[in-house]
Amino acid sequence: MIKAGIIGGAGYTAGELIRLLLNHPDVEIAFINSSSNAGNKITDVHEGLYGETDLVFTDELPLDTIDVLFFCTAHGDTKKFMESHNVPEDLKIIDLSMDYRIKSDDHDFVYGLPELNRRTICQSKHVANPGCFATCIQLGLLPLAKHLLLNDDVMVNAITGSTGAGVKPGATSHFSWRNNNLSIYKPFSHQHVPEIKQSLKQLQNSFHSESISFLTEVTLPVVFLPLS
């Protein structure tokens, strides 16, 4: 069995990761770290997992007991952790934040889009998981880049739901503000643009990075429930 640990286990991303790992026949979750929820049951936070696990959040980090470590932390926290902790050399790491998605001589993380880097991922100890928008956009554009067809400007208009903003509430995350509404955020400057450009140029070196414009919007459609 592959023993896995998770740091930052209380967010939406972690909840989905926990569900996937619980249902994986070859994985055993050794610990789920969350300093703000230490001692609480996983199902107290991720109620959709009720009946699936009796695991409890911990503030401990027994890194020498696991084979793979997942980071579900806020952007910037993974890098801080790696720089301040003695991580076992043979420990495999999968980072779900944006800290290591861009290639650099300063780290050895591989961009974790299997449709693009499957072989390299299999041989790597450190994997940077792609962003959500970046994944769906690349799956649409990479086949064109592979055949060198991205020779004109690329316009992307993408819409996401409320969970994309994370579990922490904010002024624009309330139901009364989002309900049946559509709003633009980070126009033409979304943090996923650099990784999209990086992947497109990997397959089509002639692609001009300034040729892609990315407009993101958030929405929460109204749902009508019939009353009996």
Model-derived segments and their meaning:
Residues S173-F175, N180-S228:
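Contiguous C-terminal substrate-recognition/catalytic subdomains in enzyme active sites
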Residues M1-P187, Q204-S206:
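N-terminal Rossmann-like NAD(P) cofactor-binding subdomain of oxidoreductases
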